[in-house]
Regions:
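Rossmann-like S-adenosyl-L-methionine
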Residues: 2-11, 19, 220-369
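Short, acidic/hydrophobic/Gly-rich beta-strand patch recurrent on exposed beta strands
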Residues: 23-28, 149-152, 215-217, 368
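Short beta-strand elements
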Residues: 129-141, 146-152, 203-206, 282-295, ...
Length: 369
């Protein structure tokens, strides 16, 4: 097998795509993974990593371009992740997803896998603005500007996502406004090195009703109507008090600006971990404790922490196909494992004798009931 050196440049033909969306070329029997490269392309690459059985490389130049290559519309595309496939035409993205299933079957070989029929992936008409929920980290830059977004893969660099094209436009508008309010009221923002404050914001919008719920995740207590939450066992120092998040003005300004907001909650997460949420959540504002969402021919309630599919349009397609494939009978008893708020179970509930759901998230079970 050829010995490749870090920094070495070479020309490759891309033979296929890997499960993470990278192009794969082969040189003397050695696999080379190249993000952003597409099958059929002739490319110039630079080796960045060597493992025992494969290498990784960065794309330097496309010598011969694939007819399936398109220009990504999202300006943050190259900053966000090496596994994006927005440079691949949508029909071929659907074909790629089917190929991922084929690769998985060939690798894990479940019983009878050679007889499985891999049908065409069911796509959607509008491929932008479909994500009903965002969960962005928040940071303050040196000039005082507050940004919200996601970390660049493998780094601590937060990419500002102020116009993420796959997000529901209203959720994007709300998170942008929240950033401006944090600046206006000079609220503390989390810094992993020394400063406590707001660290993450979740915004979710019902595609059925347009209702919006928000969760602020903070590393320090908050102050609302003069009360500190969560309650402290001892008197905080002046420095600690300065990092408390004073929510009064923020909450009023936010709910006045967006009448769609029905729930605002805060989650206390003081630990330095990669987990998004802490154990304690407190509702600050609630016209309703939940938002009403719908799928197929039924509606259900979602509390802020409950899980639901990010793509409401495709959830309808997914659940519809699941019901058809299950072909439920009146005497059937169904177990909905990892049920979330019970959406799949509800889809068959009227067609079977009983449905039993189970999940590890108490909020999801509460909503399902």
């Amino acid at each position: 097998m050829i010995n490749l050196k870090i920094g070495q440049k070479l020309q490759l033909e891309i033979e296929r795509m890997g499960i993470n969306g990278e192009g794969i070329g082969v040189i003397s029997g050695r696999l080379v993974f190249i993000p952003y490269a597409l099958p059929g392309e002739e490319v110039l690459v630079e080796i960045t990593e060597n493992a025992r059985n494969f290498s990784r490389a960065k794309l330097v130049k496309i010598i011969e371009k694939s007819p399936n290559r398109v220009k990504p519309q999202d300006r943050a595309y190259h900053e966000m992740s090496q596994s994006h496939i927005m440079h691949l035409s949508y029909p071929m993205q659907l074909e790629f997803k089917r190929d991922v299933m084929r690769q998985a079957l060939e690798k894990y070989k479940p019983a009878g896998w050679r007889n499985y029929e891999l049908r065409a992936t069911l796509g959607m008409e509008n491929t932008l603005g479909y994500r009903n929920k965002l969960q962005f980290q928040v940071r303050r830059l040196n000039d005082g500007t507050v940004i919200a977004g996601l970390y660049q893969e493998g780094t601590h660099h937060l990419v500002n996502l102020d116009n993420c094209l796959v997000q529901d436009p209203k959720t994007q508008e709300i998170i942008n406004h929240i950033c401006r309010l944090i600046e206006k009221f000079d609220l503390p923002v989390y810094d992993e090195r020394k400063i406590g404050g707001i660290r993450t914001v979740m915004v979710r919008r019902s595609q059925k009703t347009g209702e919006v719920q928000i969760i602020f995740v903070t590393s320090t207590p908050i102050i609302l109507d003069g009360q500190v939450w969560p309650e402290l066992r001892e008197e905080p120092s002046k420095r600690q008090k300065n990092s408390f998040v004073k929510f009064d003005k923020m909450l009023s300004a936010l709910t006045e600006e967006f009448e769609e907001i029905v729930t605002v909650a805060v989650n206390f997460h003081p630990r330095k971990t990669s987990e998004i949420y802490g154990e304690r959540t407190q509702v600050l504002f609630n016209e309703k404790e939940t938002i009403t969402e719908g799928v197929l021919d039924y509606e259900f309630e979602l509390s802020p922490r409950a899980f639901y599919q990010l793509n409401s349009e495709q959830a309808n397609v997914l659940y519809g196909e699941a019901v058809k494939a299950l072909n439920p009978k009146k005497d059937d008893r169904v177990i909905d494992a990892y049920c979330g708020v019970g959406t799949i179970g509800f889809a068959v509930a009227k067609k079977v004798k009983s449905v039993h759901g189970m999940d590890i998230t108490p909020e999801s079970i509460f909503d399902a009931r």
